[in-house]
Amino acid sequence: MRRNQTPEGHSIRPLRVGEQIRHVLAEMLMRGEIHGDTLDNLFVSISEVRMTPDLRIATVFVKSLGGASDDTVIGILSKNASFLQAAIAKKIRLKYVPKLRFLADESFEQGSRIDSLLRSPHVQRDLQENDDQEDDSEGSL
């Protein structure tokens, strides 16, 4: 296994570049450098940036943490994509500046749905029964 590969054999470079792009975009949002009246009053989270293996396309996962819908935020960011790409080109040294695609981050909803399922009475009852069975089997040894 090479130094710059994950155990599955994938290159680490797309992960590293994606994280650098995420930092640049998050910093620009924090400083209010992205044009759009709606973004001035909102908190927007950039949770992840996934790069294609050739580093030419960056999929940016965003979540609006305030009043506007994710679609509104994605629309504003998409309109400013060329401005954002130029900023990335100035701050990160790459052969090609990746094309930015913005998608709503669904992981927050999925996490809360899983959490609510784990807290449901049926699951709690099953977990309690499993704990009781394990205690009984340990006591008989």
Curated annotation (Swiss-Prot):
Chain spans, region Disordered: 120-141
InterPro entries in the cross-refs: KH_dom-like_a/b, RbfA, RbfA_dom_sf, Ribosome-bd_factorA_CS
One annotated Gene Ontology cellular component of this protein: cytosol
Protein's UniProt keywords contain Cytoplasm: yes
Keywords assigned by UniProt, alphabetized: Cytoplasm, Ribosome biogenesis
Pfam families documented for this protein: RBFA
Compositional bias annotation for Acidic residues: 129-141
Localization annotation: Cytoplasm
Alphabetized GO MF terms: ribosomal small subunit binding
BP GO terms, sorted: maturation of SSU-rRNA
Main function: One of several proteins that assist in the late maturation steps of the functional core of the 30S ribosomal subunit. Associates with free 30S ribosomal subunits (but not with 30S subunits that are part of 70S ribosomes or polysomes). Required for efficient processing of 16S rRNA. May interact with the 5'-terminal helix region of 16S rRNA.
NCBIfam families for this protein: PRK00521.2-5, rbfA
Subunit structure, as described in the record: Monomer. Binds 30S ribosomal subunits, but not 50S ribosomal subunits or 70S ribosomes.
Record family assignment: Belongs to the RbfA family.
Protein known as: Ribosome-binding factor A
Organism name: Zymomonas mobilis subsp. mobilis (strain ATCC 31821 / ZM4 / CP4)
